[in-house]
Regions:
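Conserved phosphate-coordination/catalytic loops
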Residues: 56-59, 88-91, 125
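Short substrate-entry loop that stabilizes the transition state in hydrolases
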Residues: 44-46, 85, 117
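Serine-esterase "nucleophile elbow" of acetyl-processing enzymes
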Residues: 10-79, 94-107
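Beta-sandwich interaction modules
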Residues: 2-6
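Conserved long hydrophobic alpha-helices within structured protein cores
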Residues: 1, 36-37, 142-143
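Short clusters of hydrophobic/aromatic residues that line enzyme substrate/ligand-binding pockets
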Residues: 43, 88, 210
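Alpha-helical cap/lid subdomain in secreted, periplasmic
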Residues: 64, 92-224, 228-232
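Functional beta-strand-loop-alpha-helix junction segments that form "active/interaction loops"
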Residues: 77-87
Length: 232
């Protein structure tokens, strides 16, 4: 197995269905801009379980983004579970993106869930500084950085029979927005969009979008919904 970031120069094709039959596959290369995704588990690709049910699988919103695109761009998802703005770079994942970047490409950057676990990666110190460095390096390649706020968790506090939404990622989301304004970088406010819907639906109804027993990681329903926030 691999213990570090690596480049996989293969095309994997899955054929599913009852008694599927495939006569041939025709692949035609086209030149279109690429949207690279840099982020954590809430953005990452996941494999499906069998028998498949969209509520039973983990799904990051990055794997569903191309459902909302028209073919004029392509998506390359480099997001990985457990990564922060620091470990994504230190483990070589950002180097792989830089190696492939061309002028006119896009890089969507979404971190925060794992940064907030570390004192040196808080919203007032390492988190925005690491994002600032990434933005500068993307622009040096004549590519276009896009920031995304960390998608909200379905976390509530119950007191005296009353539920109150607990916004655990407020500071990192606001730091991301502030940096975008400072550096003139577009910001996809996934945090606010997800939080608004969670509050509108309520704790229990929102569970349809999350993996069973998990208040952070979405299932495939949630992945498609969150990708819609980004596409909007």
């Amino acid at each position: 197995g691999k213990t570090a970031a690596f480049e996989k120069n293969t095309l994997d094709i899955a054929v599913v269905g009852h008694c599927p039959a495939l006569d041939f596959v025709s692949i035609t290369p086209i030149e279109v801009p690429t949207i690279y995704l840099a982020g954590d588990s809430t953005m990452a690709d996941y494999g499906a379980e069998y028998p498949y049910h969209p509520a039973a699988c983990y799904g990051g919103w990055g794997q569903a983004l191309d459902l909302y695109l028209d073919g004029s761009v392509t998506v390359c998802n480099h997001a990985h579970n457990g990564r922060s703005t620091e470990t994504f770079r230190n483990e070589g994942h950002f180097d792989l993106i830089q190696k492939q970047l061309r002028p006119g490409d896009f890089v969507v950057i979404q971190f925060g869930h794992n940064d907030q676990k570390h004192p040196h990666l808080q919203a007032y110190n390492g988190y925005p500084e690491n994002l600032r460095r990434v933005i500068a390096e993307i622009r040096a390649k004549k590519a276009l950085p896009i920031l995304a706020t960390p998608i909200a968790r379905n976390v509530w506090t119950e007191q005296n029979g009353k539920l109150t939404y607990n916004d655990l990622l407020h500071d990192h989301a606001q730091a991301c927005i502030a940096l975008g304004k400072e550096l003139n970088v577009p910001v996809l406010d996934l945090h606010q969009a997800a939080m608004d819907e969670i509050i509108r639906l309520g704790r229990d109804a929102s569970k349809i979008y999350y993996h069973q027993g998990d208040w952070t990681h979405t299932n495939d329903y949630g992945a498609v919904r969150a990708a819609g926030y980004a596409a909007d």
